[in-house]
From Swiss-Prot:
Name of this chain's protein: Cytochrome b
Subcellular location: Mitochondrion inner membrane
Gene: MT-CYB
Subunit and partners: The cytochrome bc1 complex contains 11 subunits: 3 respiratory subunits (MT-CYB, CYC1 and UQCRFS1), 2 core proteins (UQCRC1 and UQCRC2) and 6 low-molecular weight proteins (UQCRH/QCR6, UQCRB/QCR7, UQCRQ/QCR8, UQCR10/QCR9, UQCR11/QCR10 and a cleavage product of UQCRFS1). This cytochrome bc1 complex then forms a dimer.
Binding-site list for a ubiquinone: 201
Residues at which heme b b562 binds: 83, 182
List of residues binding heme b b566: 97, 196
Gene3D superfamilies, alphabetized: Cytochrome Bc1 Complex, Chain C
Record-stated family: Belongs to the cytochrome b family.
Length: 379
């Protein structure tokens, strides 16, 4: 009798994706983040579902309902903080996953890569709308500032913003629709993840050397299932340490004040994982220019397959490119720091220089350095 694992129409798909999948023998811990992102998504959907059972999307009661979850619901505080800090973990894994793709040239699988970039956009949109739901001061003003950016679009901008708001300001209609979208988007993300994996399994995984590894494959189970379990345990340890010891470490104290349209907080800033993009947005004095720079700062990832001029796929054997890559990482840390600072000297100029450097490294320096390394191969 043939194994049901290999014959059953449904189990067969799971088998080819997670059990008998041929995987390169040399993929490092940097390849763990895909499974960790899957875990993060599962945690977010489950905790989010239980939060939605007690949350009310009405401006009068939203803030109180979140307080009620934390005080009166059994382990409500745990669910709420796991969801809030789970988002931070999600983005840490996302950034590391994208960084791995850039370093090892995984973007040459361009269908997989482009769906990944779309996933990044959708996750960012979901996180933004989720931040609005507790209806604290930063929720309200963050929503006002970010949605207002769309008014920079010529001709239709103002109409578009009022259409998204459902009125003439961020109000009850906005909160209700944001809740609806925040609920549905994670399921759309899950569907996109399946497409992401579908395209990945067409080509097979990349590996640190960037060389074709067809001649040296090992089964995913047990080798990488056990390796993934280690990553999962470490992620849960990090998440629960954050949730149980300092749940508000990454949050904004202003969000413990109920939303008040008549009082603007001194410093409006998004969650930490959006600060790098926020810094790029603020570094351009023109509104439309800022919005375009903001969108392009993420969209630029789609250009990487076109900007890859090196004869080698991975950066493993390219010291100059490695150097530029880590300067880019340092630049992103700088942008994140600047995004959380007030708009004054010297932060304005540092932000502008860091923004220019970000685009220059990606569009100009990395391709140029790749060409130099190609020449050095013959030297």
């Amino acid at each position: 009798m043939t194994n049901i694992r290999k014959t059953h129409p449904l189990i067969k798909i799971v088998n080819h994706s997670f059990i008998d999948l041929p995987a390169p023998s040399n993929i490092s811990a940097w390849w763990n983040f895909g499974s960790l992102l899957g875990l993060c998504l599962a945690i977010q959907i489950l905790t989010g579902l239980f939060l939605a059972m007690h949350y009310t999307s009405d401006t009068m009661t939203a803030f109180s309902s979140v307080t009620h979850i934390c005080r009166d619901v059994n382990y409500g505080w745990l669910i709420r903080y796991m969801h809030a800090n789970g988002a931070s973990m999600f983005f840490i894994c996302l950034f590391l996953h994208v960084g791995r793709g850039l370093y090892y040239g995984s973007y040459t699988y361009f269908e997989t890569w482009n769906i990944g970039v779309i996933l990044l956009f959708v996750v960012m949109a979901t996180a933004f709308m989720g931040y609005v739901l507790p209806w604290g001061q930063m929720s309200f003003w963050g929503a006002t500032v970010i949605t207002n950016l769309l008014s920079a679009i010529p001709y239709i901008g103002t109409t578009l913003v009022e259409w998204i708001w459902g009125g003439f300001s961020v109000d009850k209609a906005t909160l209700t629709r944001f809740f609806a979208f925040h609920f549905i988007l994670p399921f759309i993300i899950a569907a996109l993840v399946m497409v992401h994996l579908l395209f990945l399994h067409e080509t097979g995984s990349n590996n640190p050397s960037g060389l074709i590894s067809d001649s040296d494959k090992i089964p995913f189970h047990p080798y990488y299932t056990i390796k993934d379990i280690l990553g999962v345990l470490l992620l849960i340890l990090a998440l629960m340490t954050l949730v149980l010891f300092s749940p508000d470490l990454l949050g904004d104290p202003d969000n413990y004040t109920p939303a008040n349209p008549l009082s603007t907080p001194p410093h409006i800033k998004p969650e930490w994982y959006f600060l790098f993009a926020y810094a790029i947005l603020r570094s351009i004095p023109n509104k439309l220019g800022g919005v375009l720079a903001l969108v392009f700062s993420i969209l630029i990832l789609m250009l990487f397959p076109l900007l890859h001029l090196s004869k080698q796929r991975s950066m493993m054997f390219r010291p100059l490119s490695q150097c530029m890559f880590w300067i880019l990482v340092a630049d992103l840390f700088t942008l994140t720091w600047i995004g959380g600072q007030p708009v004054e000297y010297p932060f304005i100029i540092i932000g502008q220089l860091a923004s220019i450097l970000y685009f220059t490294i990606i569009l100009l320096i990395l391709p140029t350095v790749s060409l130099i390394e190609n020449k050095l191969l013959k030297w």
